[in-house]
Amino acid sequence: MPIVRAKPTSPGRRFVEKVVHPHLYKGRPFAALLESKSKTGGRNNNGRITTRHIGGGHKQHYRIIDFKRTKDNIPATVERIEYDPNRTAHIALLKYADGERRYIIAAKKQAVGDTVMSGELSPIRPGNCLPLKNIPLGTVIHNIELKIGKGAQMARAAGASVQLLGRDGIYAILRLRSGETRRVHVNCRAVIGEVSNTENNLKSLGKAGASRWRGIRPSVRGVAMNPVDHPHGGGEGRNKGRHPTSPWGQKSKGLKTRNNKRTDSMIIRRRAKKK
């Protein structure tokens, strides 16, 4: 898709770079697959901030996405490709042969009129969903289940993909974009192809207000705070005086915080370190 740079008619327009998607549907979303969505402001049920930098933003409806893809051996036609404010990927509205409609994450190069199927006998085409045991080695996939029947959990963001490297007994071996290699059960399902909207990382919001529309509040540096607010706060000038930490004293910039021994055995090779 073309990338458009706005004319600098104002300071807020000067740095805007947009990815134009002329193929996206311009009408309202399918009402039967919408749910109301309330803002939390990053607070829990006690009213305390549990996630910083969240608040405000435009009102949104949640689109109910079919991550399980369990409607097997019934062909569906892509009615339209839509924008979804809840995720970076685009979504596709499917109309099945029996008349039912469902939203799915749109695959790259998926277009209106394409036929989509789920199940073990589905052809190897972008957007089709199969168990990992039925997918040829070397295939690029997305929307991958980690538990059988739970629904897709991995590789769901715009442009995301995973490569199926091989099979070892009851496990398939996958290589993630991060460089990590891990095992997933061969009966878990995955969708063929990459996720749509691959140029999402090339856009530039251009101004702070565009982040506020998305419900993202400003991030304040720790060294700009007082000692009561952050371990980096206070002092003369801008000295931290210690290893970089979070506001709660947890070391950042390289400290490993993963604590999930239950699935450690599923990871064959950890992701590569940043240089």
Curated annotation (Swiss-Prot):
GO cellular component: large ribosomal subunit
GO biological process: one example: cytoplasmic translation
Assigned keywords, A-Z: Ribonucleoprotein, Ribosomal protein, RNA-binding, rRNA-binding
Function: One of the primary rRNA binding proteins. Required for association of the 30S and 50S subunits to form the 70S ribosome, for tRNA binding and peptide bond formation. It has been suggested to have peptidyltransferase activity; this is somewhat controversial. Makes several contacts with the 16S rRNA in the 70S ribosome.
Sequence similarity: Belongs to the universal ribosomal protein uL2 family.
A GO MF label: transferase activity
Superkingdom of the organism of origin: Bacteria
Residues covered by region (Disordered): 222-275
Cited PROSITE patterns: RIBOSOMAL_L2 (PS00467)
Organism ancestry: Bacteria, Pseudomonadati, Pseudomonadota, Gammaproteobacteria, Moraxellales
Coiled-coil ranges (or none): none
Skewed-composition ranges (Basic and acidic residues): 229-239
Assembly information from the UniProt record: Part of the 50S ribosomal subunit. Forms a bridge to the 30S subunit in the 70S ribosome.
Name assigned to this protein: Large ribosomal subunit protein uL2
Pfam family, one: Ribosomal_L2
InterPro entries attached to this UniProt entry: NA-bd_OB-fold, Rib_uL2_dom2, Ribosomal_uL2, Ribosomal_uL2_bac/org-type, Ribosomal_uL2_C, Ribosomal_uL2_CS, Ribosomal_uL2_dom3, Ribosomal_uL2_RNA-bd_dom
Species, as recorded: Psychrobacter arcticus (strain DSM 17307 / VKM B-2377 / 273-4)
Disulphide-bonded residues: none
Gene3D superfamilies: 2.30.30.30, Nucleic acid-binding proteins, Ribosomal protein L2, domain 3
SMART domains: Ribosomal_L2 (SM01383), Ribosomal_L2_C (SM01382)
